[in-house]
């Protein structure tokens, strides 16, 4: 289950209803998928063949199509990151820069962990959203944020897009301190 840490205040928000309410107040969609649907051989596996990626997409076909229908997503894929990922450090450097997108950034975590650092409203400032398997998040179009891995340095996620070109980040020049 996702955990939120507000950087300015140190406040920690836990529990699905509390997390959903806080994220909703910040314009961020949060849902939770039943991760027990995932076949055992794909749980906690971070190096995936194309066939295994397709199996994950097929497992969550109904959830993906429902989310796509509600929010206008047209294409989806799987991203898998771990220490076995070629050029992982370069990818993380790219992901860890504060940026925006011209569409929502949607991730449904199917294994592992990740953190979105999201700019909230003026009063809230930046907050971390620690995600684990089953958590689904959609950072709104134009909202400054970045993503990184947690200490275990491994995640598998379904990504949904409106634009077929996929993940396209636009740098965001931050005027406030991200870490406080």
Curated annotation (Swiss-Prot):
Keyword Amino-acid biosynthesis: yes
Keyword tags: Amino-acid biosynthesis, Dioxygenase, Iron, Metal-binding, Methionine biosynthesis, Nickel, Oxidoreductase
Binding site for Ni(2+): 99, 101, 105, 145
GO biological process, one term: L-methionine salvage from methylthioadenosine
Reactions catalysed: 1,2-dihydroxy-5-(methylsulfanyl)pent-1-en-3-one + O2 = 3-(methylsulfanyl)propanoate + CO + formate + 2 H(+); 1,2-dihydroxy-5-(methylsulfanyl)pent-1-en-3-one + O2 = 4-methylsulfanyl-2-oxobutanoate + formate + 2 H(+)
Cofactor(s), names only, from the UniProt record: Fe(2+); Ni(2+)
Annotated pathway: Amino-acid biosynthesis; L-methionine biosynthesis via salvage pathway; L-methionine from S-methyl-5-thio-alpha-D-ribose 1-phosphate: step 5/6
Positions with a binding annotation for Fe(2+): 99, 101, 105, 145
CDD domains found in the cross-reference section: cupin_ARD
Hydrolase is among the record's keywords: no
Enzyme class of the recorded protein, top EC level: oxidoreductase
HAMAP family for the chain: Salvage_MtnD
Annotated function: Catalyzes 2 different reactions between oxygen and the acireductone 1,2-dihydroxy-3-keto-5-methylthiopentene (DHK-MTPene) depending upon the metal bound in the active site. Fe-containing acireductone dioxygenase (Fe-ARD) produces formate and 2-keto-4-methylthiobutyrate (KMTB), the alpha-ketoacid precursor of methionine in the methionine recycle pathway. Ni-containing acireductone dioxygenase (Ni-ARD) produces methylthiopropionate, carbon monoxide and formate, and does not lie on the methionine recycle pathway.
Subunit structure: Monomer.
Family: Belongs to the acireductone dioxygenase (ARD) family.
Identification of the protein by name: Acireductone dioxygenase
Species name: Geobacillus thermodenitrificans (strain NG80-2)
Gene behind the chain: mtnD
């Amino acid at each position: 289950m996702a955990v939120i840490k507000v950087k300015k205040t140190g406040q920690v928000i836990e529990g699905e209803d509390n997390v959903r309410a806080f994220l909703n107040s910040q314009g961020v969609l949060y849902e939770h998928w039943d991760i027990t649907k995932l076949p055992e051989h794909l749980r906690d596996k971070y190096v995936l063949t194309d066939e295994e990626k397709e199996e994950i997409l097929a497992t969550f076909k109904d959830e993906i199509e429902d989310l796509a229908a509600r929010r206008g997503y047209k294409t989806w894929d799987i991203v898998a990151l771990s220490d076995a990922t070629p050029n992982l450090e370069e990818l993380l450097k790219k992901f860890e820069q504060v940026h925006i997108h011209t569409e929502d950034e949607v991730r449904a975590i199917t294994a592992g962990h990740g953190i979105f650092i999201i700019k909230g409203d003026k009063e809230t400032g930046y907050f971390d959203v620690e995600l684990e398997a089953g958590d689904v998040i959609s950072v709104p179009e134009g909202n400054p944020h970045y993503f990184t891995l947690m200490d275990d340095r491994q995640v598998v996620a379904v990504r949904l897009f409106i634009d077929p070109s996929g993940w396209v980040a636009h740098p965001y020049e931050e005027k406030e301190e991200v870490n406080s």
